[in-house]
Every structure is written in C-alpha cells, then in structure tokens.
Regions:
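Catalytic active-site module of serine/aspartate enzymes centered on a nucleophile-bearing elbow/loop
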Residues: 199-244
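Catalytic nucleophile serine of serine hydrolases
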Residues: 1
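Flexible "cap/lid" subdomain of the alpha/beta-hydrolase fold that forms the substrate-access gate
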Residues: 4-202
C-alpha cells in the first residue's frame, strides 16, 4: 500500500544503496508521483471519463476535498472500519466499477454513514489477534496520521521529479500484481506501463489476491520473493555461510 511508494522512492533517489528492490501491488512511477499521474493510465472501458473522471482514485480526491469528513467515520468506529476495509480479493468484480470510484458521489465512505457498518471479520486477511493490535493503535492515535498520505500528492510529485537517472531503475526489480486488486488495477489497465518502461531488470508475477496481498496469500508472496532472490539476485542471496 503506501509503503510501496516509499520503497520506490528510496530505490529511485538512492540507487547506490539498493542492490535490488521488491514491491507489491502499487507499481513504480505511479502514486509516488501523485494520483494525477495515474489518471492517464485508467481503464476507460470501465471508467468513462465523463462519468468517472478519477476512476478508482476518486476516494483520494475525497480526502483532498474534505479530509475531516473522510476520516470521521473511521475514527467513530475503528473496529468496523478495519473489518470493512480488510477483505480478500473478489474475482467477480473484474471489469466492474470498484467501490473507491464513487466515494464522493456516495457522500463519503460507507455511503456517507456516520461510522462503518458491522461486517464479520474476514479471517483470510486478518486474524483476531491482528485486528486487536490495529484497533488498539488506531483507537489511541486515530486515522489522521495514516490518512495524511492522501494529502501529500503535490509534494510527493515534486520529490519524485528529483529522482536520479531520470527515474530509471537498473537494479533487479520484482513486482507482484494482485489479480483481484481493483484499486491498483494492473491486469487490464496501463497502470504498470511506466514501471515497465523504467525498469531494465523487471520481473513480474501475478498473485491471485486482492489489495491486501501479503495478508491474503503470504505463502505465495514469500515463494515469489524467494524464487526471485535465488534467480535474479543470486550474487548476494543466499548469503555465503561462514567456514567452520
């Protein structure tokens, strides 16, 4: 999620510090350049411009337009908010309008409700123990900090423009696509094309998951990373064992 633009920014601004880079769901040269950089890459067969000008990034515009209202229903009930958001991938939604594309039209998150609705825990993505940790942290600190990522697009774009080597990444790069990730939709749209143009040693793999890939399919994610390390980064992995 928002960790991905941070990782991409480290690699693009400090390539001599990065032997290789692996990332999930959010492709390079997209959100770290601001959501406006993603708009030309939308699948307009799903999101006609006259009806969905911001496509599935509509929710990010909502944060900019009314930040306090965007976080209010999450702060009102962190438990429900986390359970609503933390859901496994939905194969049946491919090619359909995703819920994040209508947030402003719907009057805000959760249809403009004062708080998130009650849903059963999706144990495929989140355990009761994990839920308790997240709820405790967000009850204590609120959603202001995490959601403030959405208020920094302009500065992120300015920083991204300072990347060295024109933003090219020449180290080995692994990118894992979520087949059912309809926020960072890379299967049918052009969202990953800038990454493909800028990464000279790119490996892509598709995982049958939604947006919360690492939680939903941890075995598949770890297997993909290990295989890539052993094949694309074999000069440093595995580390040589010390002589007895």
């Amino acid at each position: 999620d928002w960790g991905a633009p941070v990782v991409w920014s480290i690699a693009s601004h400090h390539p001599t510090r990065c032997h290789a880079v692996a990332n999930l769901c959010v492709p390079y040269a997209t959100l770290e350049r601001g959501y406006e950089a993603c708009l030309p890459l939308l699948d307009r067969s799903v999101y006609p411009e006259d009806e969905y000008p911001f496509g599935q990034w509509d929710y990010q515009v909502f944060y900019e337009e009314d930040f306090a209202r965007a976080i209010q229903p999450m702060d009102a009930n962190p438990t429900n908010a986390i359970k609503v958001v933390s859901r496994k991938g939905m194969p049946e939604m491919r090619g359909k309008v995703w819920r994040t594309a209508t947030i402003r039209r719907d009057g805000g998150w959760f249809g403009g409700a004062a708080e998130a609705p009650e849903l059963p825990l999706d144990a495929v993505v989140l355990s009761e123990a994990d839920l308790s940790v997240f709820v405790a942290a967000l009850t204590r600190n609120g959603f202001f900090g995490p959601c403030s990522w959405y208020m920094n697009h302009e500065r992120n774009a300015e920083y991204s423009a300072q990347a060295v080597n024109g933003g090219r990444l020449d180290m080995p790069v692994l990118f894992l696509i979520g087949q059912y990730d309809y926020t960072c939709e890379c299967v049918d749209s052009a969202l990953a094309e800038p990454m493909r143009a800028l990464c000279s040693k790119l490996t892509e793999r598709t995982v049958t998951s939604g947006h919360w890939m690492a939680q939903e399919k941890p075995v598949e994610v770890n297997a993909a990373i290990l295989h890539w390390l052993a094949t694309a980064v074999s000069d440093i992995w595995p580390l040589p064992t010390a002589a007895a």
